[in-house]
Amino acid sequence: MVTAPIYAILEGLFLGGISAVFESRFPGIVIQAVALTFGVLFCLLAAYTTRLIKVTQNFRLGVVAATGGIVIIYAISFIGGLFGLNVPYIHESGIIGIGFSLFVVVIAALNLVLDFDFIESGVEQGAPKYMEWYAAFGLLVTLVWLYLEILRLLAKLRGRR
């Protein structure tokens, strides 16, 4: 598919640009965010494969509902920003902003578990070959989201110094 390389290049430029901005402001933050992202990924993968975390219908519902709430808050913040309005506290380095970022990191991490479950279910049910791409793309999107949220959390923590 022609769009895959284009997407990969654009995403690389996007993540590289954001990472460069954060790195220029907070030296060393990118390597910390990358290490934490992969640490979370591997810890949750181990917890999922050993069945320390089980994906039940209630677990799935809770994670999807929390993710939807975060999307709504970010959409309101984005649209409000276009008109000069701010959602107070969540983007600041105060205790509420850090708490919100921590909550978002946890929800992003729990979305990894849903991705693992989707992949495992697809394998068990003999899903068509093209579904591998959907599963891989979903996992990639979740990892990018987790990385960006960890980056924001670390920036807020460093901003308190």
Language-model features and meaning:
Residues 1-161:
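A hydrophobic alpha-helical transmembrane-helix feature that marks the membrane cores
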